Amino acid sequence: MATLETTFAGLKLKNPIIISSSGLTDSAAKNQKLYEAGAGAIVLKSLFEEQIMMEADWLGDPNMYPEGSDYLVGYIREHKLGEYLNLIKETKKVCDIPVIASINCYQDADWIEFARKIEEAGADALEVNILALQTDIQYAYGSFEQRHIDILSHIRKTVNIPVIMKLGDNLTNPIALIDQLYANGAAAVVMFNRFYQPDIDIEKMAQSAGSVFSTDADLSKSLRWIGIASAAVSKLDYAASGGIHAPEGVVKAILAGASAVEICSALYQNSYAIIEEYVRFLNAWMERKGMENISQFKGMLNVSDLN
């Protein structure tokens, strides 16, 4: 039988199937079921900086003194952070696989201290999402990319656990950014995060939400950029996210240069049983191709081997 073990961000995974951050990973009970279903690692549901600020705005009084507003924001933040740290601790008790915490932030101020608390709570790694649409006409070129580097650099000075950067696809030069992320201590990069999709209802003549799920067509973006990045910045680990809707997608991602894949939409649309299906398919494919371990074919079809 082939060996499906892989290393991602310095973590040893029994297989390359990582459960992406979502509502599927927001409780220890759910995470235990994913672990029992065969997942290689779990990324906990993200804690969103903007959600904390929005909740504080919703509960606040516009006529409140600044001191009162600051207290409310601080109270809500501490409450949410406390809940999240408990999620880490409880999940670690029931899951004997890597548990990766996740934060979604657009500034680095208070998240640096929180990263330290995440490590103390027992998280095996931290995934950082800096997903934002830049719509300010005055926003300087390159500022968004520099924000990634600044936040990563500050977090790396605070924690010893691996820091994983999950990127959006709205970057001008992903390879240049990835090279700088590696230089500043990133252990791995996930490609790509996914924006909520907009739509328009022509009967109501109103904006509406698009599909919340990815499709298999989304995988091509990850294959392209992981194929390029894994050749250009080869010492980093990569994971493909978005579009893994069939077990063949796992093989494709590894051939492109990924060490692992993150899945979410396929679990929502099917069941936890697909984890075992993906693992079985990968094992059968490797045996059919005479592959004894994942390193034998990882990156076999990245750009360096196609030129």
Task: Label every model-predicted segment.
Residues 1-18, 84-92:
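N-terminal amphipathic alpha-helix/helix-capping segment at the start of soluble metabolic enzymes
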Residues 251, 256-292, 296:
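Shared catalytic-loop signature of beta/alpha-barrel
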Residues 64-70, 74, 219, 227, ...:
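Extended, intrinsically disordered, low-complexity segments
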Residues 24, 108, 267-268:
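Short strand->helix junction
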Residues 28-66, 82-89, 93-100, 104-240, ...:
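Alpha/beta enzyme core
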Residues 12-18, 71-74, 162-163:
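Short, basic, glycine/proline-bearing loop/turn elements
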Residues 14, 25-30:
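Short N-terminal binding/cap micro-motifs at the start of the first secondary-structure element
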